[in-house]
Every structure is written in C-alpha cells, then in structure tokens.
From Swiss-Prot:
This is Adipokinetic prohormone type 2. Its main location: secreted. Residues 1-22 form the signal peptide. Belongs to the AKH/HRTH/RPCH family. It comes from the Eukaryota. GO terms for biological process: flight behavior; neuropeptide signaling pathway. The modification Tryptophan amide is found at residue 30.
C-alpha cells in the first residue's frame, strides 16, 4: 500500500513538472501564418457583421 502511494505521488509530481515545462516553453507566435498587412477588407466585414447584428437585435425587441 505504501509503495503504491509513493508511486502515485511520484507520477503526479512528474506530470506536474511536465505540464509546467510546457507552460514555460509556450510561444505565442507558434503556428501563425503570414497575414496580409492590409486589413481593410477584414475591418469592413467586421463592421458589416456588427451592423447586421444590431439590426437583428432591434427586430427582436
């Protein structure tokens, strides 16, 4: 019984250490694709969606 508890505790410590190492090594730039610096079409679509959402919200009241 005591050996099983020690093994479980050791496994828990190893898992916690592995997770903390993964958090320390995380990079926010990982996996990003090249984005077009001209974001005007995206801004236009975002504003258009907002306008339509406001219209729909106004109709439901």
């Amino acid at each position: 019984m005591r050996q099983g508890c020690a093994l479980t505790l050791m496994l828990l410590v190893v898992v916690c250490a592995a997770l903390s190492a993964a958090q320390l090594n995380f990079s926010t730039g990982w996996g990003r694709r090249y984005a077009d610096p001209n974001a005007d079409p995206m801004a236009f679509l975002y504003k258009l969606i907002q306008i339509e959402a406001r219209k729909l919200a106004g109709c439901s009241n």
